[in-house]
Design a protein with these regions (language model features):
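N-terminal strand-loop-strand
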Residues: 51-90, 118, 122
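Juxtamembrane/interface motifs at transmembrane-helix termini
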Residues: 45-49, 100, 196-197
């Protein structure tokens, strides 16, 4: 039902972007409201709140892009940052900004959230957030790009706005994860690519 709501929302957004007839535009606005109500039934969030969130986008509806950067040290520990929003831990990352290439987006996020200067050396995976079962359900379709990155040795204080803490963790001693951003399987796949860079990029 969530996928139906997302598809209805995308159709409404496209219609509001390219439609010209006043009656059609009104129907597309009604369709957008129905999509918000349907997603509300799935997620438990208020339909009014979802309608505002869905109405922020304009133009042809496309998936949003989330980038995540995995950095490992010689002891196979992974660099994680503690999210201010939920107090849990994640690979550094976030929404890609317009004007950023995927690799520059992920290295910018790593710098802002951990203080580490780095370079992206490999695309680990392009995953569909829903297929990967990253909770909670969102009212938009999301592609998640995971990169293997390498620090260049330069470190500065991270941006306090988003980050509570930064740390290195062994895979058998991971802290509570912010599962909407990264799950255990995704970290395991990132480590596999760190250990064997010849592995092919994964995708859904």
């Amino acid at each position: 039902m969530r996928r139906i709501a997302i598809k209805l929302s995308a159709l409404a957004q496209d219609g509001l972007t390219y439609g010209a007839d006043a009656y059609d535009l009104d129907r597309y606005r009604q369709l957008s409201q129905l999509a918000a109500e349907l997603f509300s039934a799935v997620s438990g969030r208020p339909a009014e709140e979802l309608a505002v969130e869905l109405g922020r986008d304009s133009g042809y509806a496309t998936p949003k892009v989330d980038v995540r950067g995995a950095i490992f040290d010689d002891a196979k520990r992974v660099l994680l940052m503690r999210e201010r929003t939920d107090g849990r831990w994640s690979l550094p990352g976030g929404w890609a900004d317009p004007g950023d290439s995927p690799s520059s987006a992920v290295t910018r996020e790593i710098l802002e959230e951990t203080g580490y200067h780095s370079s992206a050396v490999k695309l680990i995976a392009c995953w569909d957030r829903e297929i990967q079962q990253n909770p909670p359900p969102l009212p938009v379709h999301v592609y998640k790009l995971f990169f293997l990155c390498r620090p260049d040795g330069t470190v500065q204080p991270p941006a306090a706005l988003e980050t509570l803490d930064v740390g290195w963790f062994a895979m058998d001693g991971l802290p509570p994860l912010s599962l909407g951003r990264v799950n255990h399987r995704q970290l395991e796949r990132a480590l596999a690519h760190h250990l064997d860079p010849a592995l092919p990029t994964e995708f859904d």
